[in-house]
């Protein structure tokens, strides 16, 4: 996640989010802070629906929605979306966002020149008319009391508010001013913008700061942001292969991929994995797999290396006091846990699952409610996505253990590589 946008209403979430999406960012709008976003999102837009709330409730909503995302490392870029006509709890929400993101400065540039919203000499103008003289002043839910933005902000914030006028923006002085304000402590900086180029200059000045300020604006400033601020590098991510089948076909496919240097393998001790003290084996497998995936290597979890492993099942059943069915179910369930743990710690580009029991167990561990089939990699080997799962719309290829030629696994890895470049 590269960027978090906190908006106070749904349509505002969307009109700002689309500025980033149209430049190629994977942008997701959440209607509630409790929702779980996609692992592949570049930009997360959270709607607090707080515009008409009492100021203290709005501040609490913003802080609660934003603070968990600012505890990660590296911290994402934070953008506080506000109404371009300054309706709502501007001061309270900006202050809460500064506290949650631990930013000393907030830069407010809510102009949208293409929509007739501009800022000149610290005042909000709508098609050239001061805000207080427009219909927005008498908004039934959130009326406006001033055209001067600093006055609106100061009504709900004790943080000092400064104004930077157009001439300073256009002569290139904004960056130095922001640095100077930061040296004085906390500050909210209201910046003039009349044309799109002014917003570009504001974005550039913000990027030049040693510590990125909280950006506060509407669709206009969002559109002016350079893409490297909110888009992750596109790269092919490794595939996690869970080879739980003991079939000869699956063994040949795994061996073929290893011989061709297409993947690395983590061998699983089935006896340890099904034991009552499997935690150590699970932790070891997860650690090894994550290390390989972090090196962008396709990684295979293998439960059977040799044909004679099949002959050991009866002995393992006797030792574990389980039937073949019980043993298979426990192994599948534990592999599901392993897969979930790996996915929580590593970035992957897709899943390849061999064996029906394994595929079912992994789907369950990931919380999938179904499987959406999209295409066929090879005869009887589909590619699709799990529905409402922990891995969103990452490709998942499933294969019955005995299906496929020796090259099927390599073909599947190539297929996923060509489909996705990851997040």
From Swiss-Prot:
Disruption phenotype: Deletion mutant is unable to use D-threonate as a carbon source. Its EC number is 2.7.1.219. GO terms for molecular function: ATP binding; kinase activity. It comes from the Bacteria. Substrate binds at residues 9, 51, 81-84. Pfam families: NBD_C (PF17042), SBD_N (PF07005). The keyword Transferase applies. The keyword Transferase applies. ATP binds at residues 245, 355-358, 401. Keywords: ATP-binding, Carbohydrate metabolism, Kinase, Nucleotide-binding, Transferase. InterPro entries: 4-carb_acid_sugar_kinase_N, 4-carb_acid_sugar_kinase_N_sf, NBD_C, NBD_C_sf. It is an enzyme of class 2 (transferase). It catalyses: D-threonate + ATP = 4-O-phospho-D-threonate + ADP + H(+). NCBIfam families: ThrnKinDtnkGamma. Catalyzes the ATP-dependent phosphorylation of D-threonate to D-threonate 4-phosphate. Can also phosphorylate 4-hydroxy-L-threonine, with lower efficiency. This side reaction may serve to deal with the toxicity of 4-hydroxy-L-threonine by converting it into 4-hydroxy-L-threonine 4-phosphate, a useful product that can be used by PdxA2. Belongs to the four-carbon acid sugar kinase family. This is D-threonate kinase. It comes from Salmonella typhimurium (strain LT2 / SGSC1412 / ATCC 700720).
